[in-house]
């Protein structure tokens, strides 16, 4: 089907190619913002179409976030995402180290990778250990989480006195912020999505829009 669609486009536009799908093509995102999503993978449901119109997505990072949020669990965070997306300059971060991690999602924890980055950058976890804690959060293992909450805040030393995990306090994050942040991470981690998966879905969707956009403008179906 895609091969036939590409050939049809090439008949009218010889330079057309599926090999170079622009990730920020204005015409493509204008179509999404206007709700033209019929037949587009991931985006053609009424709810998703409405969300795309509301968000006025401008780039592939917006699409990745929307795909990750439009699921039964994280749907509750969509209003906060839309509000922050609209007023990006007003988004506040509990600690400066969070900005480079959450800036792309306007202060919202959406991806599994973000959860792991927070554990690494604020508390000194290795990414491997951070992923173990993330999985414990998603499975609601309360005994593990209480232990890790203490480690996240205060750190953990090896028998020789060296730090296995430095903890937030030893990295300049105050205790109140660390405790609040752990609770927020725990709430979000239950629903956090793998960004790589969402990115793959977004690229497929963009490819379908890219291949259909010239024919739509010509009224070909």
Label the predicted regions.
Residues 197:
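Pyridoxal 5′-phosphate
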């Amino acid at each position: 089907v895609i091969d036939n669609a590409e050939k049809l486009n090439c008949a009218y536009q010889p330079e057309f190619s599926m090999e170079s799908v622009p990730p920020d093509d204005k015409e493509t995102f204008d179509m999404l913002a206007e709700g033209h999503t019929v037949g587009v993978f991931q985006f053609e449901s009424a709810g998703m179409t409405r969300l795309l119109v509301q968000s006025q997505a401008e780039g592939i990072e917006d699409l990745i976030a929307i795909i990750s949020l439009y699921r039964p669990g994280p749907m509750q965070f969509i209003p906060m995402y839309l509000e922050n997306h609209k007023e990006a300059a007003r988004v506040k971060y509990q600690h400066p180290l969070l900005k480079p991690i959450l800036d792309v999602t306007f202060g919202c924890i959406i991806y599994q990778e973000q959860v792991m980055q927070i554990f690494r950058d604020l508390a000194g976890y290795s990414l491997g250990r951070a992923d173990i804690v993330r999985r414990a959060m998603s499975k609601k293992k309360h005994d593990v989480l209480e232990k890790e909450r203490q480690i996240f805040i205060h750190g953990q030393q090896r028998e020789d006195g060296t730090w296995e995990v430095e903890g937030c306090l030893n990295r300049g994050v105050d205790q109140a912020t660390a405790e609040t942040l752990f609770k927020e991470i725990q709430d979000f981690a239950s629903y956090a999505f793998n960004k790589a998966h969402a990115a793959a879905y977004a690229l497929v969707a963009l490819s379908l829009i890219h291949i259909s956009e010239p024919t739509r403008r010509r009224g070909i179906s």
